[in-house]
Curated annotation (Swiss-Prot):
GO terms for cellular component: cytosol. The keyword Cytoplasm applies. The lineage of its organism: Bacteria, Pseudomonadati, Pseudomonadota, Alphaproteobacteria, Hyphomicrobiales. GO terms for biological process: ribosomal small subunit assembly; translation. It comes from Azorhizobium caulinodans (strain ATCC 43989 / DSM 5975 / JCM 20966 / LMG 6465 / NBRC 14845 / NCIMB 13405 / ORS 571). This is Ribosome maturation factor RimP. Residues 193-211 have a biased composition (Acidic residues). It holds the Pfam family RimP_N. SUPFAM superfamilies: YhbC-like, C-terminal domain, YhbC-like, N-terminal domain.
Amino acid sequence: MNETVEALDPNEPRLITESGVAARIAAIVTPVLADLNLRLVRVKVTARDGGTCQIMAERPDGSMTIDDCEAASRAISPVLDVEDPITGAYRLEISSPGIDRPLVRLTDFDRWAGHEVKVEMAVPVDGRKRFRGILIGTRAELAVVKRTDAPKGEEPEVSLPVADIGEAKLVLTDALITEALRRAKAAERGLGEDEEFEDDADEVFEGDEADEKAAKDAANAERANAKKAADKAEKRAGKVARKAAKSEKAEKSQAKTGKARLSKAEVDDLAVTNPASRALRGGKPKAKETH
């Protein structure tokens, strides 16, 4: 099998972009990343962990190392401090696009053809906003997807204007993990757009199987951790609800007891002023003495 690493155009514009504060940050950091021979993939600002600004970037060959992330963080942080686009404290997070990466440029839809994708349109197509299926590639400025969620009798192939896409993201599968690792290995070897290496069916990169297993294990662990966190949150919510119910029950019981004590006190007061009322407490009034 022949493998090449396609060089990316560092100046290719993103067709899927941000809005609001994230758009302003994107405009600020794009030239900073370009000076580092990196290009912006996406900016996302969330309230997570007290405020997070996540910036995804990549090299012209599609890779992104830890050293790249550190260099980008050192370069971007002081610029954001000066421009101050975010109100309040926040945490800056620089990362690679990841295996299940967002697709933001026209060439992204060609480079990852053959893999499963989820698309959410900013502008509906045939009354639909969400699509899922196998990415076929592009025609002109349209992303072509063979839908796996198409109802029976409906045409599965759909052409989506890339400029009207709100978000497009690869779906994490075993095939995608294998391909992403293969490309990462090729990038490590410094293979350019026109360079190839032979990868026979019986020959694999040293450590590829272990790396692939580690990636799959990491993906499974991430899913397990998400489920564990959800279960923990559900248990915590149930515990809080039970505690609240118990507290409410105790308050009602206390109020009822207080009322009973008050009634008894009233009977006692009545008994002092009228001995005959002792019958109210289960006693009998004394007979009058005769002389």
